[in-house]
């Protein structure tokens, strides 16, 4: 994922458009159906895992410590995650109420977590583990009914043909020469492997184009290939721009759609399916020293706020080098899953509600039901703007209690019952007249 860049570089990224052919993209019917499924799913598990986990300092450790590529390669023989259990990971996602998983097939270090035939810089050929974790996860997701997306970094700190260098990767010791077109051929080769050898994928989550914003990334060629290989697979890119033709969803890193607290997300919110990608602590890859864990209430609030903005939440864990997911992450996921088992009706299958986000919370909607998510409000009376249709009834989702309300031409005023102790989100269900 992306770390803050110097201001001058960030401005250059924002002001320069990549040279990409603007082709006419008509999504297939299967793709449109997959988009609707994606919007219904609402919650996914993001996994950042690779040889960098050995250094216990996040996924950017190669860049942050200025590690040369030749030195970094010595990590691979030490990477032997014998405690990795694909069934356990997928079951954990299920228990959390997640409907899909997105895992790093290749991060910025260039190391493939699958058995690539176009490179030997991968988990099967360079590590004593010698197993294809992407294949194992793909098979287990099919068994347990989740969809698998693959994260793929366009940026590469290891490949010699990733040249000219971009904003990062200058201390890796690679020769100051290379053929970027040849690198893109290599990238397309690996993507073809993923899209032809691992069954039906949910889609691909690109990252790293921001490293060389002025480059011609041959998006049309790559996107056409992917859509031809798997028409239903969704293509998205974390480039922090307005979506390009061929992209099927728009993501926001460490922010809700329309916000830019992290400094990355300057693009307007599109009409494509949306996704917020966020961490449980402050790191994407495993970081032993990062103990700044979000509480269950914070994660639930993030999920609810995303849903109220018509977006999914892709919540990240960074597994340990052993293949285990640390206890703090597992605990948090189980807590969120318990909340969703009680309140999932107001999340799954919904879209952003008729009321724009407010300081007190958000609304979601499913057919004739509007779910009022009261996250932060002390007054027993809550005034809502006028709704598209008359309100027939108002009840508390948790226990079915009736909620008194008054409706006028100007709006609806709810009289909220006392909140239960520790209640993160008081959800009032409004039944609208048909």
Language model features with spans:
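Bacterial N-terminal signal peptides
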Residues: 6-16
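Mature catalytic domains of secreted/periplasmic carbohydrate-active enzymes
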Residues: 22-434
């Amino acid at each position: 994922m992306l770390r803050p860049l110097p201001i001058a570089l960030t401005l250059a990224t924002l002001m320069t458009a990549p040279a990409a052919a603007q082709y006419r993209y008509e999504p297939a019917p299967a793709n449109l159906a997959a988009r609707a499924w994606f919007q219904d799913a609402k919650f996914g598990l993001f996994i950042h895992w690779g040889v960098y986990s050995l250094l216990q300092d996040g996924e950017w450790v190669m860049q942050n410590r200025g590690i040369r590529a030749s030195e970094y390669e010595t990590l691979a023989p030490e990477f032997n995650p014998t405690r990795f259990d694909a069934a356990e990971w997928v079951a954990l996602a299920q228990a959390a109420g997640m409907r899909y998983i997105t895992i790093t097939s290749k991060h910025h270090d260039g190391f493939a977590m699958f058995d690539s035939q176009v490179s030997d810089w991968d988990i099967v050929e360079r590590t004593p583990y010698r197993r294809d974790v992407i294949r194992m996860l793909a098979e287990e997701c099919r068994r347990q009914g989740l969809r698998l997306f693959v994260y793929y970094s366009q940026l590469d700190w290891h490949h010699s043909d990733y040249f000219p260098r971009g904003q990062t990767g200058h201390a890796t010791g690679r020769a100051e020469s290379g053929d970027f077109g040849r690198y893109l051929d290599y990238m397309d080769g690996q993507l073809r492997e993923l899209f032809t050898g691992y069954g039906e994928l949910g889609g691909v989550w690109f990252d790293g184009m921001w490293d060389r914003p002025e480059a011609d990334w041959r998006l049309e060629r790559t996107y056409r290939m992917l859509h031809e290989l798997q028409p239903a697979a969704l293509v998205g890119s974390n480039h922090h721009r307005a979506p390009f033709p061929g992209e099927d969803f728009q993501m926001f890193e460490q922010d809700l759609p329309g916000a830019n607290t992290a400094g990355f997300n300057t693009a307007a919110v599109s009409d494509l399916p949306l996704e917020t990608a966020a961490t449980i602590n402050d790191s994407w890859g495993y970081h032993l020293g990062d103990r700044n864990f979000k509480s269950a209430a914070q994660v639930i609030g993030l999920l609810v706020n995303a849903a109220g903005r018509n977006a999914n939440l892709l919540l990240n864990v960074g597994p340990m080098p052993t293949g285990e997911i640390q206890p703090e992450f597992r605990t948090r996921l189980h807590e969120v899953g318990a909340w969703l088992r009680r309140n999932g009706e107001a999340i799954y299958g919904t879209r952003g509600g008729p009321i724009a986000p407010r300081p007190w919370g958000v609304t979601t909607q499913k057919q004739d039901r509007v779910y009022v998510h009261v996250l932060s409000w002390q007054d027993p009376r809550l005034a809502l703007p006028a709704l598209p249709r008359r309100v027939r009834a108002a009840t508390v989702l948790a226990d079915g209690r009736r909620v008194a309300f008054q409706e006028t031409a100007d709006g609806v005023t709810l009289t909220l019952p006392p909140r239960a102790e520790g209640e993160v989100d008081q959800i009032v269900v409004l039944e609208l007249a048909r």
